[in-house]
Amino acid sequence: MAGKKLPSCLKKRDLLNSDRVDNSELIKLGQNYLQEGFISDCIDFFEKAEHFEGLIQLKEKCAAEGDYFLYHRLAKILRDSPSPEEWNQLGDKALGLGKLLFARLAYERADNHEKAAQVEKLLQLPLEERTSGGKGLH
């Protein structure tokens, strides 16, 4: 850790289940988790604090990182329904980063059956063939 003390899992649970914690403290803790790379924990604190600006920024970060699961979680929290184009962009990003499962799930959300099927074929290949650089979607 880079000097930020994060609460224990029990303290985190207590903070997230308390009605007596100030939103500014929750946001600060969320920022600390984010700085340490714990995005899911950051989401927990931002959601509790109803820090929608921070949640929107995290959604953009997750899209840029091709992270299907956190992006989907944030879309639910924000009551957002990403368009097929947004899901396709997430799928393309995930695919480019080698996150094949995330790519397939994003393409399925976009109803892009062709790309989802192509990624599924890649998932069936032995790992060495997936990462050799010679195989992939073009």
Language-model regions, residue ranges each:
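Extended alpha-helical solenoid/arm regions of large eukaryotic scaffolding proteins
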Residues: 1-138
